[in-house]
Each structure stands twice: as C-alpha cells, then as structure tokens.
Amino acid sequence: AGMNVGLIAATFLDVGIDGLIIGAGFAASQETGMVLALGLSVELLFLGLAMVSDTMKGWRVLLLSVLLAVDVLAFSLLGNYFLAGAGHIAISAILAFGVAALLYLVTDELLIEAHTVAEKPSSTLWLFAGFLIFWSIQLYSA
C-alpha cells in the first residue's frame, strides 16, 4: 500500500542492467569488473537511499534493499556466465553499449535536473574527487 510499483519495477530493471554491465566487466577482466562494481556501487547506494520515502518504512525498506542486492548479484553472475567464453569484440560491444546508456542518462537526465538546484562549490569538489578516486583505483590496480 502506498508503494509506487512502476518506479520499483523500473528500478529493478535498471539495477539488473547494471548487474549485466558488471558481469560483462568481469568477463573482460577482473580489474574491469572491480572498477565497474565499485563505480556502480556508489550509484546503487544513492539509488537505494532515493527509494526510501515516507510511504515505505521498516521491513519494506529492508526487503527492497535485499531484493535489489539479489537482483544486481544475479544479473552480474548471469552476465559473467554468458559472456565468459565470448570474444573481446562481443564483450567490448556490450560494455560500449552499457557505457553509452549510462552517459546518456547522466547527460540527458541528471545534469539537466541537477542545474535546477542551486549549485555549491563543494558539490563540484566532491564530483571531481570521486573521479580522481576511481581513476586512482584503476591506475594502482594495473
């Protein structure tokens, strides 16, 4: 009662696609999979926090969080299973499609929406700090 079923279904679809991207990353290499898993875990943290509202409290929040975690894990395993024997071209194409979808979402939806709120210099600092952290992780894991 009071839960937006359409929003929850879309969230599960989004998280499933994120899981497939993580699985494709692990099929490419362990390093790629780890970088994608770390990067997308930040997105999933904020997605989970955004799902919590006044209409959803208590055990429903816990249940939704567990089901989202199972969703991303299951799709990661499926992506890795089906792409483990695939060639580099197929994996690269799937990763390119996934990255293009993520970039489209960021540029078309999130950046436009972000500029409707007053921007603070600390927000920009945290954005660039996040990029530097993930870039450093990739550099040091090589």
Where are the language model's segments positioned?
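Intrinsically disordered, metal-sensing/regulatory segments
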Residues: 1-142
